[in-house]
């Protein structure tokens, strides 16, 4: 065969064949050297020959013998990290490349930490957010466990807080007890100076408030009407006066005017009727004109004269109302200096610590004096004191002490007569519907209902006779 023939079959020249060709005397030594044999292909457990993949595992471990390799790994793991050479060198292992790699691998196996793998910079969409949430939840769990491990200290703190609160409550109790003992030690005629609280408020005029109310008490005697003026009114009766005032209360409520306006209007009517004779058909005109004058005197924005003409069902023209206004003012000599009972009620309410319920009932009881002619002979300060006394009695607010008597200006004995007249009016059947409905609303705390219920139960303690007839049946001479 020609060796240079490129189309001929190529023969493989191995190292053994090359050695045989180069040997000059192969039989000189008497024994021929065996040629180097090629490495046998690895066979599997079934004896079949297995080919190694081009880029497969270098360790020649295939799928067929996974069990054998696992057993081998288990055996090597049992022996530990120290090799035979390490044992012979007295426990000091010589550092070599293989040893370094093995030591690093062993250290990695023994010191595996989950956060170390999570600390790598993740790519987009690698789920790093969930890993961070997991670590934060682990931290919160650790904090919870730390908090659960500290109950004794917290219990001690809570006990200290409870002890401090108990001490504070005991101190408050001691202060209250001391205040109560001081109140008990005070004499019964002790009068508290309540005006010193208003020294910094210029609107209260605390420096000369005493002189102001002394002047009002002098002035109220000058503005009292004649309690018997009905005697020289041939066409009028007390019943008609009550009907007129009840209608004026309805007008006053519709226009939403001040309480002072209503009291001044009724006082103007009584003072004018004490000086002039009025026919029955002109009585309503006197009432409308008096309300018009009072609204001008007390209100910031008073209703127009046309409004008063309208509420009177156009019975009187605007000119008639204006003419009546001029005539009334001329008769009274333009004297509108009327000491309103609301001023006295506010003065007494200061000693009552401005209790809103007591004050509302007091306003209702004071307005009784507008409808009942029997109150015409009493000054407004006495009516205000009696109203406050009865309101406190109904609400059970305590006795009429020296402080209340000082700021009211009347003792219990001095207001007893007016007080009994109020109980008498409350005990009788209702005859002034507008007045009763006004104070039966929630705005006025249902004062008319409450006071009448009280009078029905306790009237026998303060008035002698059990009155059943309505107020309108009272004779003029009573």
Curated annotation (Swiss-Prot):
GO terms, biological process: cell division; G1/S transition of mitotic cell cycle; traversing start control point of mitotic cell cycle
Gene Ontology MF: a single term: cyclin-dependent protein serine/threonine kinase regulator activity
Sorted UniProt keywords: Cell cycle, Cell division, Cyclin, Mitosis
Compositional bias of kind Polar residues: 77-102, 133-145
Gene3D superfamilies assigned: Cyclin-like
Keyword RNA-binding among UniProt keywords: no
Pfam families (alphabetical): Cyclin_C (PF02984), Cyclin_N (PF00134)
Listed SUPFAM superfamilies: Cyclin-like
GO cellular component, one term: microtubule organizing center
Region described as Disordered: spans on this chain: 1-153
Domain of life: Eukaryota
Comp. bias intervals (Low complexity): 16-31
Biased composition (Basic and acidic residues): 65-74, 110-121
Annotated family: Belongs to the cyclin family. Cyclin AB subfamily.
Function: Essential for the control of the cell cycle at the G2/M (mitosis) transition. Interacts with the CDC2 protein kinase to form MPF. G2/M cyclins accumulate steadily during G2 and are abruptly destroyed at mitosis.
Protein name (database record): G2/mitotic-specific cyclin-B
Species name: Emericella nidulans (strain FGSC A4 / ATCC 38163 / CBS 112.46 / NRRL 194 / M139)
């Amino acid at each position: 065969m020609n060796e240079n023939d490129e189309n001929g079959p190529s023969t493989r020249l191995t190292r053994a064949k090359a050695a045989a060709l180069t040997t000059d005397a192969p039989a000189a030594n008497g024994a021929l050297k065996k040629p180097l044999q090629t490495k046998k292909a690895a066979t599997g457990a079934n004896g079949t020959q297995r080919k190694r993949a081009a880029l497969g595992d270098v360790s020649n471990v295939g799928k067929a013998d996974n069990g054998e390799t696992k057993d081998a790994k288990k055996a090597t793991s049992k022996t530990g990290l120290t090799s035979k050479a390490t044992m012979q060198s007295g426990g000091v292992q010589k550092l070599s490349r293989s040893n370094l790699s093995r030591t690093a691998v062993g250290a990695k196996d023994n010191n595996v930490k989950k956060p170390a793998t999570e600390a790598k910079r993740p790519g987009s969409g690698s789920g790093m957010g969930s890993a961070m949430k997991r670590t934060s939840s682990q931290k919160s769990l650790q904090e919870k466990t730390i908090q659960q491990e500290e109950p004794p200290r917290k219990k001690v703190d809570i006990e200290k807080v409870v002890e401090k609160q108990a001490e504070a409550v005991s101190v408050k109790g001691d202060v209250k007890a001391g205040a109560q003992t001081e109140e008990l030690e005070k004499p019964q005629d002790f009068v508290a100076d309540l005006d010193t609280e208003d020294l910094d408020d210029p609107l209260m005029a605390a420096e000369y408030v005493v002189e102001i109310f002394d002047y009002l008490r002098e002035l109220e005697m000058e503005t009292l009407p004649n309690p018997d003026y009905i005697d020289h009114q041939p066409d009028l009766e007390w019943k008609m006066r009550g009907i007129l005032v009840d209608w004026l209360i309805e007008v006053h409520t519709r226009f939403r005017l001040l309480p002072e306006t209503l009291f001044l209007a009724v006082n103007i009517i009584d003072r004018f009727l004490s000086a002039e004779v009025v026919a029955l058909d002109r009585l309503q005109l006197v009432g409308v004109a008096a309300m018009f004058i009072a609204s001008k005197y007390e209100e910031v924005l008073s209703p127009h004269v046309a409004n008063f003409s309208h509420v009177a069902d156009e019975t009187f023209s605007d000119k008639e109302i204006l003419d009546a206004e001029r005539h009334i003012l001329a008769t009274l000599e333009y004297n509108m200096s009327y000491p309103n009972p609301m001023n006295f009620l506010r003065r007494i309410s200061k000693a009552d610590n401005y209790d809103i319920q007591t004050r509302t009932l007091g306003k209702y009881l004071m307005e009784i004096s507008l409808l009942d002619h029997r109150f015409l002979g009493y000054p407004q300060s006495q009516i205000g004191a009696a109203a406050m006394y009865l309101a406190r009695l109904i609400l059970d607010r305590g006795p009429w002490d020296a402080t209340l008597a000082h700021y009211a200006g009347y003792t219990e004995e001095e207001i007893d007569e007016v007080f009994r007249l109020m109980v008498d009016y409350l005990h009788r059947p209702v005859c002034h519907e507008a007045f009763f409905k006004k104070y039966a609303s929630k705005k006025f705390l249902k004062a008319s209902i409450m006071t009448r219920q009280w009078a029905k139960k306790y009237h026998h303690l303060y008035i002698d006779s059990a009155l059943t007839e309505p107020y309108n049946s009272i004779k003029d001479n009573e």
